[in-house]
């Protein structure tokens, strides 16, 4: 089974119950845990739009529920969604879009 299918299939189990459960920082530098990112690509400035979108893309694609709640901010994710969604695998994008709509 392709990796994208495995990630999409597990997405529902990995997402918090609500986007409102996302309590990540609104500013500062986030250092990703090693299980999410290879060495050298682990620091992301949350106040930099591009860095933040890269961070959120990695966490939504590879992260577990506790990673998402700790590293992703609900308000910033909603603001970034129009641009971020285009960079995600289509199955991940559709799953996240449904999840974000449900919580509005």
Feature-to-residue mapping (PLM):
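Long, compositionally biased intrinsically disordered regulatory segments in eukaryotic proteins
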Residues: 1-104
């Amino acid at each position: 089974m392709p990796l994208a299918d495995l990630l999409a299939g597990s997405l529902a189990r990995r997402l918090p119950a609500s986007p409102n459960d996302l309590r990540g920082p609104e500013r500062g530098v986030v250092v990703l845990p090693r299980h999410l990112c290879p060495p050298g690509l682990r620091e992301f400035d949350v106040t930099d739009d591009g860095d933040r979108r890269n961070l959120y893309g990695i966490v939504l694609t590879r992260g577990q529920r506790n990673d998402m709640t700790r590293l992703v901010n609900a308000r910033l994710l909603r603001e970034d969604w129009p641009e971020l969604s285009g960079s995600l695998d289509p199955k991940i994008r559709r799953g996240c879009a449904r999840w974000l709509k449900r919580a509005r």
